[in-house]
Amino acid sequence: QVVANDFWLLFSCSVGAFLMRGAGCTWNDILDRKIDGAVERTRSRPIPSGQVTLTQAIVWMMVQIALAGLILLSYNFNSIILGLSSLFLVVIYPFAKRFTWWPQVFLGLAFNWGILLLFVAHTGSLNWPIIALYFAGIFWTLFYDTIYAYQDSQDDLIIGVKSTAILFGAHAKKWLLSFILFCFVLMAVSVFVRSEEHTSELQ
């Protein structure tokens, strides 16, 4: 049965995800301001182009985090802890391209955290179907962000930034096919396991 709390969770998680994505992107732009200034596609971004000062960017990031935090405090204890723990992934992601060829994995871990958070906010705990769905989201992120990274691969090579696009090179197609395959398999597993659980609950 759908209740008012379900609508609140759907609405608030959507707003919270929007705010935290904005905060994460701002944090990424703050740390990458010198890199962005050296890349053709990104040198016109607000910070490297001088449209926004570093102080303004930091204040804007903190405002977004504060608003998302207020939403998080309306949830149960487990989801508050889960939400706070996501900050580690948000903080570390911009550094990932500096020490690993797989920064897209860190992006996937961070971007799809909301799947876990919404479920825990609704039920109070995790289960295997939702964990499978979370990993499906990670593979989906690996798929699309690897494609996205190819447009900067030449500049990234020059300045020493790592990515799966550079790592895969001419072998990208088989990797991308693998990612999308794993994504669909994990989504199917999630649906199947949950349907089996639901059937057993009705018996």
Predicted regions and their residues:
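Alpha-helical transmembrane segments and their lipid-water interface positions
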Residues: G24-N28, D36, E40, Y144, ...
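Calcium-binding loop positions in Ca2+-binding modules
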Residues: I30, K34, Y150, Q154, ...
